[in-house]
């Protein structure tokens, strides 16, 4: 049985970020982590753990969102691009009624910014977050920084995170270890 103080956070694993024709895709490197994410999500539920799916969401043409100036429109509410990618969508459809599976809309890089994630984790006495998904050097990184600042223990599954460039991936993994004291495995 799993220690009840850990949660898996599957961050932004959507069609727009992962599918070959996604609006802001990591492409093949993002697709390669799919089986690791599914394995960890299944393991988490088997061990009575928690799976949170903090997922980027945008409204088309929002002039006030800072990402509008940086990136093309992506993860628009109610679109295919915002749906989970591949096997994760199938996994979610199968497990969405499970009370230990929680989808969380987020509008910023960090899963903690402007959400009730911290309250949900603390209500469940969770003190450790295991992060997987995309993008390692953007949303995974910002979530990890906030988790660190909020006092959570951080685990990064190296085979479960991906980003646009090899340099970004390597830099972020080192930063997790050296600046946040995260366990990278």
Where are these regions (language model features)?
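Active-site loop signature of alpha/beta-hydrolase-fold enzymes
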Residues: 16, 59-60, 162-163
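Loop-to-helix element that buttresses phosphate recognition and phosphoryl-transfer chemistry
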Residues: 27-39
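Short acidic, Gly/Ser-rich segments with clustered Asp/Glu that frequently serve as metal-coordination loops
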Residues: 14-20
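Active-site-adjacent betaalpha module
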Residues: 1-7, 36-47, 72-185
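Short beta-strand segments at enzyme active-site cores
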Residues: 49-56
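Acidic/polar short surface loop at catalytic or gating sites that assists cofactor/ion binding
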Residues: 60-78
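Short glycine-enriched, charge-decorated loop/helix-capping segments at active-site entrances
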Residues: 22-30, 69-75
């Amino acid at each position: 049985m799993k220690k009840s103080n850990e949660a898996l956070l599957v961050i932004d694993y959507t069609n727009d970020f992962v599918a070959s024709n996604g609006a802001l895709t990591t492409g093949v490197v993002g697709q390669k982590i799919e089986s690791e994410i599914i394995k960890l999500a299944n393991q988490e539920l088997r061990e009575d753990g928690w799976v949170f799916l903090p997922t980027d969401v945008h409204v088309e043409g929002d002039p006030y969102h800072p990402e509008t100036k940086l990136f093309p429109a992506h993860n628009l509410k109610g679109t295919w691009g915002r749906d989970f990618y591949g096997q994760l969508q199938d996994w979610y459809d199968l497990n969405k009624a499970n009370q230990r599976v929680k989808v969380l809309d987020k509008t910023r890089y960090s899963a903690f910014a402007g959400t009730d994630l911290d309250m949900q984790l603390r209500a469940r006495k969770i003190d450790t977050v295991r992060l997987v998904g995309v993008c390692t050097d953007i949303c995974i990184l910002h979530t990890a920084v906030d988790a660190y600042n909020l006092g959570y223990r951080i685990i990064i599954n190296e085979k479960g995170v991906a980003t646009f460039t090899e340099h970004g991936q390597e830099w972020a993994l080192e930063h997790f270890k050296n600046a946040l004291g995260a366990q990278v495995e």
